[in-house]
Amino acid sequence: MMQPKKTKFRKAHKGRIHGVASSGATLAFGQFGLKAMAPERITARQIEAARRALTRHMKRAGRVWIRVFPDVPVSKKPAEVRMGSGKGAPELWVVRVKPGRVLFEIDGVAPQTAKEALTLAAAKLPIKTRFVARIAE
């Protein structure tokens, strides 16, 4: 699973996701992609599950780019612990995704296969997504 090797701070504020994505909103590498349509926090496990679904459906053909990286730690207190006594230990890593952000890109497969693979990957994510394709130039 993806997580940073080193961070400046161990814990992060919860934060809010405002606005729409300005960077990472267009296809940069592949011919087809999966674009987020709503603001959401996506965990490293969800990204990995979607990546596995993609590569398995493509039967290892083509190329996959993951355009998001979980760099925000989410802390959690242990079960049945009273409130107070500080913030819990870092539990998982998430990425804050704004609407319009491209999550995955693929290339080297047929358009029909690409759409099927990205639909399977989208089912693993807690977010409404859209299939996008590069316009033929």
UniProtKB/Swiss-Prot annotation:
Tell me which InterPro entries the record gives: Ribosomal_uL16, Ribosomal_uL16_bact-type, Ribosomal_uL16_CS, Ribosomal_uL16_dom, Ribosomal_uL16_sf
A Gene Ontology molecular function term of the record? structural constituent of ribosome
Q: Which SUPFAM superfamilies match?
A: Ribosomal protein L16p/L10e (SSF54686)
Keywords recorded for this protein, A-Z:
Ribonucleoprotein, Ribosomal protein, RNA-binding, rRNA-binding, tRNA-binding
Pfam short name (any one): Ribosomal_L16
Single GO cellular component annotation? cytosolic large ribosomal subunit
Q: Which cysteines are joined by disulfide bonds?
A: none
User: Among the record's GO biological process terms, what is one?
Assistant: translation
HAMAP family (alphabetical): Ribosomal_uL16
Question: What functional role does this protein have?
Answer: Binds 23S rRNA and is also seen to make contacts with the A and possibly P site tRNAs.
List the NCBIfam families hit by this protein, alphabetically: rplP_bact
Into which family does the record put it? Answer: Belongs to the universal ribosomal protein uL16 family.
Q: How does it assemble?
A: Part of the 50S ribosomal subunit.
Q: Please state what the protein is called.
A: Large ribosomal subunit protein uL16
UniProt organism field:
Nitrobacter winogradskyi (strain ATCC 25391 / DSM 10237 / CIP 104748 / NCIMB 11846 / Nb-255)
